[in-house]
Every structure is written in C-alpha cells, then in structure tokens.
Swiss-Prot record:
Knocked-out gene: effects: Larvae do not absorb dietary neutral lipids, consume very little yolk, are small and die by 6 days post-fertilization (dpf) with pronounced edema. No defects in intestinal absorption of short chain fatty acids. Loss of visualization of neutral lipids in the vasculature, heart and head structures by oil red o staining. Levels of apolipoprotein B, vitellogenin and lipovitellin unchanged. No cardiovascular defects or global intestinal function impairment. Increased expression of Foza2 and Pgc1 proteins. Leads to excess angiogenesis and yolk absorption defects.
Protein role: Catalyzes the transport of triglyceride between phospholipid surfaces. Catalyzes the transport of cholesteryl ester, and phospholipid between phospholipid surfaces. Required for the assembly and secretion of plasma lipoproteins that contain apolipoprotein B. Required for yolk lipid utilization and absorption of dietary lipids in larvae.
Alphabetized SUPFAM superfamilies for the sequence: Lipovitellin-phosvitin complex, beta-sheet shell regions, Lipovitellin-phosvitin complex, superhelical domain
Stated name of the protein: Microsomal triglyceride transfer protein large subunit
InterPro entries, alphabetized: Lipid_transp_b-sht_shell, Lipovitellin_superhlx_dom, MTP_lip-bd, MTTP, Vitellinogen_b-sht_N, Vitellogenin_N
Length: 884
C-alpha cells in the first residue's frame, strides 16, 4: 500500500509542476476573434484628456493555431490577421477641426499599406512569449511595426516573477503578478534596450528629466486571453522649469468577441518548414520595432531655411528672442544637411551674419557639419580670428562632443596657426572637451589619452609665460584628478598669474579630491610660510581652504590672521567669514565653533574697516532651480581695484552648474595716483584684464592693457566703450530621443535651448576726478523648445512647449579715491524683462489636411537692483550724493 501511495504522490507532484510551468495554449481548429485598438495621445502632463492630439487605429484581429510543436506542446505558431481597419482622431475635436472626419482607412493609409496591414502574419508563441514574428520583408516598416504591436499584446506568463524579455518596445525587465484569472505585466521602461540612439546634455541642471510607466492587465478565461489592456506613458520635462513638459500616452486594447470554427493546424516537424509551406515570402523580421524615416514633403532645404532666418541672426538682433529661436531652427536644418550644402551656405553668407552661422554649424555636431567648418576655416591666417574663436567656443559648449571633434582640435593645435590668441584658445577648449568626454565614460579613447598627456606635461614643457598660463587654463577646464599635483605645484609659483590660475582651478574640483598635501600647500600660500605672495593669490587660497572641508585648526588660523594682514585684505577676509555665516555655506558650523574662542572672535578682530567685500545672495528661487550669486572685491591699500570676481550658480536635481564667472584683475596702478604698493607687489608690471568662465567652460582671458606704456596710450585713446569678452549663440540644452512604444509606434522627443549672449567689460580711470569705474555687462536672450511627436508615413501628431525671455544684468563698481578711506559703490542691476510661455499642438495627414492650435502666456518681470550689504548701500549714497 505504501509504495502505491508514494507513486501517486510523485505523479501528483509532477502533474502540478507541469501545470504551473505550462503556458497558454490555443485549440486546434478554432478561430479566436478579437477587437483591437491602439491609441496614441500627446499633450502636456497637466493637460486635460480632451486636449490630446493623436490618433486611434481600431480593427478586428483573428488568431488561429497554425502549427504546434509535437515535442513541445507550448511552442505554437499562430496566424494573425488584421481586418476592418479604421483610423480616427484621439482628441475631442469639433467636426470642423477633425481632419479624420469623412476619411477612409484607405485614403489615410494608402492602398499599398492597407493591403499589407491586412495581410496575415505569423507569431511563434512559446510559453506565452513571442519568440519570433514572420512577415513579408517587402512590407513597409510602419506596417510591420503595427503588427509587432498587436503581437506584443500576447506576451504573458502564468506564474509571478521577474525576467528580461523583448517585445515591440525593446528588451526590458518585466515583472509579472498572477492572481487567479488575472495577469499584470509591469514593464520597467528605464531598463529597455532598443536599436534607437539619441543624445542628451551632460549637465543635469540644463538637462531633461523623464518619467515613464507601462502596465498590461490581462484577463484569462479557460486559459485563453479574454482581454488585455495596456497603458504606457512617457513624460519629459526641462529640469530648470518642469512646467515645460510633454507627455505621450499610448493605449492598447485586445478583447475577445467570439470563438468560432477555424482552419486546422498544419503538420510539420519544425517552424522553418511550416512557415515556408504557409508562405514562401515570409521571413523572420524580429519582435522589436525597426527604424523608420518619414519623408518630409515640402520641407525647406538648408539654403531656404538660411534665407528665412538670416535677418534675425544679424549682430543688432542678437539681444532679441528671435535670434536664438532662429538659431535652433537653423541647427535643426543643418543636422539633416550634407557637407556640400553646408559649405555652399558658408561661402555665400554676409560678413556680419557669418559669425552666427559658424556658431550654428559647429553646434549641429554632425560629421558633415564638423567636416564642412574645418574645411571652411583657415587657421593659418590671422585675419580669420573672430570666426576661428567662435568655432572654438562653440566646440567648448558642445552638448555631446565626439572623439572626432577633439581629434580635430588636436590636429589644429599641431598645425600652423596664424594667431597666438587662437593657439591659446584651441588648447584651452581641448581641456573642456576632455572633461565632457570623460564625464560620458569615454576617458580611454585614443584622442582623449593623447590630449590628457599633452595637457599634463604642458606647463613644464615651456618657458613662455603665456604658454604656461594656456596649459594651466586647459587643466582648469579638464578637471583631471591627475592634474591636481600639477596645479598644486604651480599654486606655489613665484609668478602671480600662475598661482591665481592654479588655485582657482583647484577650487573647481570636488572637495573630496583635495588631499592633505594640497591643503598644506594652500595654507603655506595664505600664511606666507615660505615666501611673500600677492594679495589676490592669498585671497584665492583662503577661498579654496574654506570650501574644501577645512579642519578646526585651519579655520582658526584663518580667523587669527585677521588683523595681521594688509589693510584691505583684513576687511576682505572679515567679509568672507561673515558671508560664510550669513549664507550658511558648508563650513559655517565649524566657523561658529571656532568663534566660541574669544581669542579668535573679539571686537578688535571683527571691527576692521575697509572697502573690500565678499557677499553672496539669491538671484532666483523656484521649485525647479535655485540661482545664487556672489561678489568678491579686493582693493589695494591705495584704493585701486586689485580683483573683482562675480559668480552665478544654478542648482537643480542635486547638481550644480557654474553658469558664469567674470573676473577683472588689475595690478601696478599705484603709480597713477602716486600711492605706495602693498607688500609683495612693489615690482608688479601695470596690467588689467578680464577672464570669463561660462557654463563650466573657462574661456581665453582678455587683456585691457599690459605695461606702463600700453596703459598710458590706452588711457589717452580710451573711448570708454566696454571690451567684448564673449559674444555668440550657444546650444545650452540638446536632447534627442526616440521612444519605441509597445504599440509599434515610435515617439520622437527633442528638447533644445538656444542662448544668445554678449558679455563685455571695461575699466575707466579719471585722474582729474580721481575716480575709477569697472563694469561687467551681460546681455542675452533665451529660448527653450521641447516637442514630442509621433510621425508615421500616413499621419503625424505632436505637441510643443516652450518659453523665451530677454534679460540684461549689469555689475558696476565705482571707486572715488580722492580721500581716505576711499568710497566704493557696487551696483548689480537686472532690467525689466519679458517672459513668454507657449504650447502648440498639431495633427497632420499626408493629403495636407492639418489641425493646429497654439496658446501663449506673456508676462513682464520687473527689474530690480540686487541687494548687497548695508555698508555698500551707505557708501553708494555718498558716492552719488551730489547727483541727488
């Protein structure tokens, strides 16, 4: 009895295991008739469903068992036939606005596509998984993709768990939850891998965020799919303004209508033989959607686009929003153009618009555009300096640079260059490209390794001061961990310019990379343990110490130094400490702890007077982004500006972007007012210059004058007009993505931000009025456009969101040194500027019928003067008192 019972238990266990492991099966000789619909809608995430644009395809779908593997019962070949096709709008439009009204499926799809879509196809179904799809290879790609979408609705399994599987949208991690007669299939879309390629901006602050979800709910009856409902959403938004977002919603529904008598299965040993017997034109075409290239009928070519936008790209139009908008249109056209087309436009462009065209061609970042611009520019000639520098800056701001771009600059640097300034810019910009490629994980590419070796060895390979500075600035852009020892070495240099560049470069590194040895070097510089340093060098060293996780003793020694420094540096360091406390910078808790010691914190130390200052504040705070600024100004003891440093930062998505840094440095000007230089600065050559860092890219510094004779000649010929530091068009945000949907349709998303910018600065001296004035002027216009489209070769629908603005920011410092203490007034003004948001939606048929809707909202943001410390306000009243 016991052996028999044991045998029964074993048989029961085997049967149960077999049942759990079995997949869904269709019966022979039966036809399963379903209704099917797939719908795609596009809108803003906050838009009402009635405001969607898109289309719906509905049909009947008949499925029957064509063949079953005699050895593996769960391997089945299904024949699927689509019929009674209808195409209609997914939005709720009036009859007047419904472009699908009165149109038949044949008039929309075309006779060839309709016949191909209604042609039966085969699906190899094993354990509920689609292993292959068979169709005629000559069928249009759009038709095959729609068939893949229908087949994807059959994907299922009868036990819970996670696995990687492929359907129309790609190979993804899928989670199944099985409960009696219901199967819930959740696809983790962030894991999906497909044949589609795209690119995005490297900076999270300027980048795009996405949210996506996909779920299919399958209801079973007697082991057969009774219904399957799929919902898939993709939302893309601009990090700096999440309201500017687009959404695509895809729905699929498969519902069993009836089960009727159908054809019997075909006999055969293997799949290949059966498929050939059914239709010798059938080939395995894969499950994942294939790429399609919809043809744009009536779209303008590059020359036509250029003629339409060139008037908005003239220099006098760059401060208007039309300039970056036209720039984005031109970049879009350039990316579809050949090298010869691009060269033709370059060669037939006016001199005034050519610099802007160079910006656009370089920003296109295609092999054709790069090859065309390199052939057009002649770096051996000095007279092309403006165009050459615009090309180099556009490379530095490239959103997704390639190895070929870096290799091209390396070859330019090794060739004949007619201008010293261009030679410097080439090397400096190579550093910026190096960093961006390393951030993409491409640090081991051959060109990257060559440039890395060049930059690391560069400072020690030359005795020319300008070349050493060039390599140090390139390292400041590259931010290589291997560059820290090189920068630490030059930070202690006897040449002030080397020290300043090296120290400000170290400040850009992650504090975790600043080693104890580097900190010791910075402390030696600040406290002058080995030699005397210039004030601006010591101040820069103090900034790095305070921002690099300082120790208790480091902070204490900084505080104890106040009172033993040159007069204006005492005031600068005091302002710096107070700014750390007021703005709650990372070191503020440690500073508070040190200040509990009365030796470090007392009235004598904290009552130092002077005009130097350090101040941080908020420019803007929104739910999406926080924008801060800081202004540091250091004067010599005689009242002449030594260093002015303005920084603007943007923070979003836990990432920081150094949006702007403008530094004006001056030295050796005491002789103009018969004043005595500070300690360590007695032998400095007269010099004034300006350096800019824009969107994390250090640009080549600009010299106002160098040497006493140059100073005097410029003073007598000075017009008072500011000197341009950087001017041009920048592709700030650049995101391109193709989203394969489970329905077999493909959504394309493009987000781009164009910025026209003009940064200039100047210094004015009046010996008669004993007054100096420095100015930094920032003017620009910003346009951001994001669109999501589903474009087949028979219908297209899309939604576009955007916003634009024009702004001016001026920073002016006025110093009156007719008496001591001298009067200093700092002004940071933002003018009133317009702000516009737009939303447009569109549906279009090949016949030319189109529905479009556009809405916009305008507002004016009032201008303001950014608040600085109260001491500055009091000083400004005195400076401008006579005028009041």
């Amino acid at each position: 009895m016991m052996p028999v019972a044991g045998l029964l238990l074993c048989v029961t266990a085997v049967l149960c295991t077999s049942a759990l492991g079995a997949g869904p099966r269709l019966d022979n000789g039966k036809l399963y008739r379903y209704s099917y619909s797939t719908e795609v809608g596009l809108n803003r995430p906050t838009g009402s469903p009635g405001g969607n644009v898109g289309f719906r395809i509905s049909s009947d779908v008949d499925i029957n068992l064509a063949w079953r593997n005699p050895e593996i019962q769960d391997e089945q070949l299904l024949q699927v036939k689509i019929s009674n096709i209808q195409v209609e709008s997914a939005g709720k439009h009036s009859r007047k606005n419904n472009i699908f009204h009165g149109s038949s499926a044949e008039s929309i799809l075309g006779k060839v596509r309709l016949e191909a879509l209604q042609r039966p196809f085969l699906v190899l179904w094993k354990m509920g998984k689609i292993r292959s799809l068979y169709a005629q290879k000559a069928e249009p790609a759009t038709v095959k993709n729609l068939k893949r979408g229908v087949a994807s609705m059959l994907m299922m399994q009868l036990k819970s768990g996670k696995m990687s599987e492929a359907d129309a949208s790609g190979k993804c991690l899928v989670e199944y939850k099985v409960n009696k007669h219901q199967v819930i299939r959740t696809k983790h879309l962030e894991t999906c891998k497909s044949q589609e390629t795209g690119f995005t901006t490297h900076s999270p602050v300027l980048g795009i965020s996405g949210k996506c979800a996909a779920e299919t709910v399958i209801t079973l009856e007697n082991g057969i799919i009774k219904s399957a409902d799929a919902k898939e959403t993709h939302v893309l938004s601009i990090n700096a303004r999440h309201k500017a977002a687009t959404k695509v919603l895809s729905r699929q529904s498969l519902t069993l209508k009836a089960i009727e008598a159908g054809p019997a299965e075909v006999a055969g040993k293997d799949v290949a033989g059966v498929v050939k017997a059914l239709d010798d034109k059938f080939l395995s075409v894969g499950v994942i959607v294939e790429k399609t290239k919809p043809k744009c009928k009536g779209c303008p070519n590059l020359m036509e686009t250029w003629k339409a936008v060139r008037s908005q790209l003239e220099p006098n139009s760059l401060s208007k929003a039309e300039a970056p908008r036209s720039f984005l249109t031109l970049v879009h056209s350039l990316r579809k153009s050949s090298k010869s087309e691009i060269l033709t436009v370059l060669q037939n462009c006016s001199k005034t618009a050519l610099p802007q065209l160079v910006d656009a061609v370089t920003s296109a970042q295609t092999p054709s555009s790069l090859s065309a611009i390199l052939e057009f520019l002649d770096f051996s000639k000095k007279d092309g300096l403006i165009l050459q520098e615009r090309f180099l800056y556009a490379c530095g701001f490239a959103s997704h640079p390639t190895e070929s771009m870096l290799q091209s600059l390396l070859e330019v640097s090794q060739g004949k260059i007619g201008s010293t300034e261009i030679k410097e810019s080439v090397v400096i910009i190579m550093g910026a490209l190096l960093r961006k490629l390393c951030l993409k994980g491409a640090c081991d590419l051959p060109a990257v390794l060559k440039v890395k070796e060049l930059l690391l060895a560069g400072p020690d390979s030359t005795q020319e001061e300008s070349e050493v500075q060039m390599y140090l600035l390139a390292l400041k852009n590259a931010l290589l961990p291997e560059g820290i020892p090189v920068l630490a070495k030059y930070a202690e240099s006897e040449v002030g310019a080397y020290s300043t560049i090296a120290i400000t470069a170290l400040q850009r590194y992650d504090p975790a990379l600043i080693t104890a040895e580097v900190k010791k070097a910075l402390n030696r510089i600040y406290h002058q343990n080995q030699r005397i340093y210039e004030k601006n060098v010591r101040a820069a060293a103090a900034d790095v110490i305070m921002s690099s996780n300082p120790s208790y003793m480091e902070v204490k020694n900084l505080l104890l130094s106040i009172g033993h420094l040159p007069h204006e540096m005492n005031k600068y360091m005091l302002s710096k400490i107070q700014d750390v406390l007021r703005f709650q910078m990372p070191a503020y808790k440690l500073v508070r702890q040190v200040m509990k010691d009365m030796i470090s914190h007392n009235y004598d130390r904290f009552s130092k007077t002077g005009s130097s200052s350090a101040y941080s504040g908020f420019m803007a705070e929104t739910v999406d982004v926080t924008c801060t600024y800081n202004l540091d100004i250091l004067y010599s003891g005689s009242g002449v500006l030594r260093r002015s440093n303005m920084n603007i930062y943007g923070q979003s998505n836990n990432a920081l972007l150094h949006g702007l840094q403008v530094t004006i440095e001056a030295q050796g000007l005491e002789s103009l007012i018969a004043a005595t230089p500070d300690e360590g600065e007695e032998e400095l050559e007269s010099f004034a210059g300006m350096s800019a860092l824009l969107f994390d890219v250090q640009l080549r510094p600009v010299t106002f004058f160098k040497g006493y004779s140059d100073l005097m000649s410029k003073m007598f010929s000075m017009s008072g007009d500011p000197i341009n530091v950087v001017k041009g068009l920048i592709l700030l945000t650049d995101h391109s993505q193709v989203i394969p949907l489970q329905s077999g349709l493909r959504a394309s998303a493009e987000f781009q931000a164009g910025l026209s910018i003009d940064i200039s600065g100047g210094m004015e001296f009046s010996l008669w009025y004993r007054e100096s004035k420095t100015s930094v002027n920032n003017r620009g216009a910003l346009v951001i456009i994001g669109n999501m489209t589903v474009d087949t070769d028979f219908v297209s629908a899309g939604v576009e969101v955007g916003f634009e603005t024009e702004a001016t920011l001026d920073f002016i410092t006025t110093v009156q040194f007719s008496e001591y203490p001298f009067l200093v007034c700092m002004q940071m003004d933002k003018t009133t500027f317009p702000f516009r948001e737009t939303v447009s939606k569109q549906e279009k048929l090949p016949t030319g019928q189109m529905f479009s809707r556009k809405r916009s909202r305008d507002q004016v943001v009032p201008g303001s003067e950014f608040p600085l410390h109260q001491e500055n306000s009091n000083m400004c009243k005195k400076v401008f008192e006579p005028a009041w």
